[in-house]
Amino acid sequence: MNVESILARKGTEVATIAPEASIKKAADWLRAKNVGALVVMSNDALVGIISERDIVRAFSRYGEPVASMQVKEIMTQGLITASLGDDLTHLMRLMTRHRVRHMPVLRNGKLAGIISIGDVVKHRLDDLELEANVLRDVYIASHPRH
């Protein structure tokens, strides 16, 4: 299974926000979209990502004034990205190595979707369930009851 097949199942909609938006707006948008991260876009270019974790860290560091700060002040830059052809094992290694929970997916340098660690786990579990069902069916077929 690869990134493209995961996106085909989950969809390619990505919640985005501008770098000049307030952290309050980002938090509201995260809640409204029920997502854990927003991709930060400027003039159709991927410039960063802001996650719930980024907001919690900023709140811990700066206190209440963080709500009026801009997304670009606390977003993660220098992103690790995935490509549509990346396989699930490669993706899991990247996410683990770089300790990220959300990874933008690019197609020809343009944003094509986003994959979360939850998406990876769900699809891995689906694969394992299918494999277990196939093995069970093979066993049952090869061991008829008398």
Regions found by a protein language model. Name each.
Residues 1-12, 51-81, 87-96, 117-146:
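Tandem CBS (Bateman) regulatory domains
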Residues 1-47:
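A positional/architectural concept
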Residues 30-33, 38-54, 95, 103-120:
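A glycine-centered beta-loop-beta connector
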